[in-house]
Amino acid sequence: INTPNINRLAENGLRFNRFYNASRSCPSRASLLTGLYQHQAGIGRMTFDEELPGYRGTISRDAVTIPEVLKNAGYRTSMIGKWHVAETPLREDQRDWLNHQVQHETFTDLSNYPVNRGFDTHYGTIYGVVNYYDPFSLVEGEVPIESVPEGYYITDALSDRAAEEILQSDDTPFFMYLSYTAPHWPLHALPEEIEKHK
């Protein structure tokens, strides 16, 4: 597999040799967004409320997020991509719930959406596991996006939106958190990318 950017990072990048990651996925994301140990942030495991302190499945109201601090300091803040640090309600029929074609007014409590945790704007998904061609829980701010255009591919859509946000920058200090779904399963790749590796 041709990986020029990863190769360049390996050759010229900084190596952290006294660094560890205490957990995977959602807990690490919560730590990154708050600067706290994942249990202090409220996500000790994943985004299910286990009704135990440190395992509430969403970033705690006591945990201040980086964009909340930066917004108070005069920054414009933007989040593009996968949020996946808010409680994921369980449904009896998970397949029905995860079907993008079934519309929902909200995907978690609105107070836990990125635009209510310090980000001025958010384009992306609330949940973590999505179809790359027709993503479930795709929102603009608090509003669900009911359909995507033909040929939609979430990795490209997130990159394009991030570039648009950067181009809109003025003299206001700007912070963007870009969180791709890739390389999370279901690992959907564009046909032309797959063809390169046959």
Language-model features and meaning:
Residues 1-198:
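Formylglycine-dependent sulfatase
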